[in-house]
């Protein structure tokens, strides 16, 4: 066996014997470092004759390449083994029961729970969920919804505006989820015109909205849910039935009395506000009984101007829409006194008012059981 073969055998044995990356590095330095055994062999090439160099050069360089490859392979093996060992030490048995302590139990935030309850109810009535961007243009937030120039909502003290862009246009944080109604109508109108699919619209729109307001019952960021129906035969009777069914299901009562009061919204005509019967004599509001009335939501028939700007002929199509504050109805249903507590991230509050993760709301099993 030649000297090179003996040297290669010894180095490969040292590599195989290394048990960690420090050991591999020590072998590399001993073989390929400045004064390493393979490096010393390479240095001898300079003192050889051309004939000897031609014979020994490929052999020594081949040794260097094989040693380098063996070092790399062993280093990879050791890294994989280290990762596997760490995973074995840190593995968690996901089948073990959760520790029953207040600190370890997760809770669903009431806002998330109420959104799930609302969407479950409307999904049962054939509605789909629609969403849109929090940052909107003036057109979709105001103009397309029939807000005239000079309307108070367009003022800086009511709306969060961004600085104008290079074209002088200002975007804003949406003040309601209504822009999604316009986006959806435009989408369906385009589908009708291009593909001939004249489908009715039935959507519910939960989301965050923003206004410059902050007190015990108002927050600069709050949650709204709106609904929209557009069809050739949509009418006030349909709207009243949908809202009655929603109120009965959401407040979990067998029947509910509703009254509609004339109101004004730029995007609906006629516009009404809906009150439902309740009893406010105790610490918590009881719905479906008593002699009191409580405002729940606003609604109305979609204004002809809104239909027209969204691609619908108001002589052919009608629609109705409604909207309510998710935070407010959560407070009413579950007896929460201060809206600001929703956003304080107080673990004690979440523990008290939150819901268990597996309490998935369904109409069949009960919404908040």
From Swiss-Prot:
Q: Which gene encodes it?
A: pheS
Name the coenzymes or cofactors required: Mg(2+)
- List locations, semicolon-separated: Cytoplasm
- What Enzyme Commission number does this protein have? 6.1.1.20
UniProt remark on cofactor binding: Binds 2 magnesium ions per tetramer.
Protein's organism: Brucella abortus (strain 2308)
Subunit structure, interactors included: Tetramer of two alpha and two beta subunits.
Q: Tell me one Pfam family matched here.
A: Phe_tRNA-synt_N
Q: What is this protein called?
A: Phenylalanine--tRNA ligase alpha subunit
Q: Recite the UniProt keywords alphabetically.
A: Aminoacyl-tRNA synthetase, ATP-binding, Cytoplasm, Ligase, Magnesium, Metal-binding, Nucleotide-binding, Protein biosynthesis
Any one Gene Ontology MF annotation carried by this entry is: phenylalanine-tRNA ligase activity
Q: What class of enzyme is it?
A: ligase
User: Could you tell me which CDD domains the record lists for this protein?
Assistant: PheRS_alpha_core
Entry annotated with the keyword Transit peptide? no
